Every structure is written in structure tokens, then in C-alpha cells.
């Protein structure tokens, strides 16, 4: 099983240890890859719509017409157990699962409209970098649930 995450920008150095930790843990269950694509521009010099459209183009280049699941503030909220079941059902339908997280300004509507599904990590607002860590942690937790393994050690 392959899981890919596409996200604009890059990860801050202070989040790298958590990122590495969860990627290593997840590789026990699936081949995980995270691809950071170029941001859409400078908020100080360009308007939000232009930046969102540019980011959408960078994401679409990476997607190459593949189906994807969008992690979005307006998506469906799931418990960890519900997310595990969602992941299991998706694994049974697709050989590869691609997730997309928006950049600092969110996501362009063109991507939102074409998502296979939309999931919310929370109704609270997090930086897109924190969403990467939360996604990795929740996906690791989901696999532990599906394997009936204890999460806490």
C-alpha cells in the first residue's frame, strides 16, 4: 500500500523530528511519501486568489490526474476510529492513496471540487505544517487501530 501526501511549502526545522518519527513508524504499515511543492507566491506582493491558483497548479502537476483526498477545514470530521475505517475502505478500493493539504492560505476551489473525499482534522485552524504532523500521527494511529495494536507504550 502506498500513501502519498502533497503539501505546499516546506517543513520547519523544529517540526522535522516529529515528521521523521511518524514517517518511520508509518513505513511499517505502508510506503509513505510526502512531497512538498512550491508555494504560490508572496502574500506581501500578491493577492490571495493568485497565490491559491498557483499552488493549485503545483499540486495538480504532482497529482497527474490521480484521485485524491483533501484535508480541508470544511471536510467531514471523523473520530480516530472512523478515520481508520475510512482508510481501510479506501485501501480496499485504491492501490495508492493520495492526500492533499492546502498551503498557508488554504486550498483553491478547483481542487476542493475535484476531491474524492474531504476530511477535516479539526474545526480549529492549524498551520499547514502542523497539519502534516497531525495527519501522519492520525494515520499511524489508524493503522494501529486496524491491526488491533495498542497505541500507547
UniProtKB/Swiss-Prot annotation:
InterPro entries per the UniProt record, alphabetical: Alpha/beta_knot_MTases (IPR029028), RlmH-like (IPR003742), tRNA_m1G_MTases_N (IPR029026)
Enzyme Commission numbers on file: 2.1.1.177
Keyword set includes Methyltransferase: yes
Alphabetically ordered keywords of this record: Cytoplasm, Methyltransferase, rRNA processing, S-adenosyl-L-methionine, Transferase
Localization per Swiss-Prot or TrEMBL: Cytoplasm
UniProt subunit comment: Homodimer.
Function of the molecule: Specifically methylates the pseudouridine at position 1915 (m3Psi1915) in 23S rRNA.
Family: Belongs to the RNA methyltransferase RlmH family.
Protein name, UniProt field: Ribosomal RNA large subunit methyltransferase H
Organism field: Fervidobacterium nodosum (strain ATCC 35602 / DSM 5306 / Rt17-B1)
Lineage: Bacteria, Thermotogati, Thermotogota, Thermotogae, Thermotogales
Gene that specifies this protein: rlmH
Amino acid at each position: 500500500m502506498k500513501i502519498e501526501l502533497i503539501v505546499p511549502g516546506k517543513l520547519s526545522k523544529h517540526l522535522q523530528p516529529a515528521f521523521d518519527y511518524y514517517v518511520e513508524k508509518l513505513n511499517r504499515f505502508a510506503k509513505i511519501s510526502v512531497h512538498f511543492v512550491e508555494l504560490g507566491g508572496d502574500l506581501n506582493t500578491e493577492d490571495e486568489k493568485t497565490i491559491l491558483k498557483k499552488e493549485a497548479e503545483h499540486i495538480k502537476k504532482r497529482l497527474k490526474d490521480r484521485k485524491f483526498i483533501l484535508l480541508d477545514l470544511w471536510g467531514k470530521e471523523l473520530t480516530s476510529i472512523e478515520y481508520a475505517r475510512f482508510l481501510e475502505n479506501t485501501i480496499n478500493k485504491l492501490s495508492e492513496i493520495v492526500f492533499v493539504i492546502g498551503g498557508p492560505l488554504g486550498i483553491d476551489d478547483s481542487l476542493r471540487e475535484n476531491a474524492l473525499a474531504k476530511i477535516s482534522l479539526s474545526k480549529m485552524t492549524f498551520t499547514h505544517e502542523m497539519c502534516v504532523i497531525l495527519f501522519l500521527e492520525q494515520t499511524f494511529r489508524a493503522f494501529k487501530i486496524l491491526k488491533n495494536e495498542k497505541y500507547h507504550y
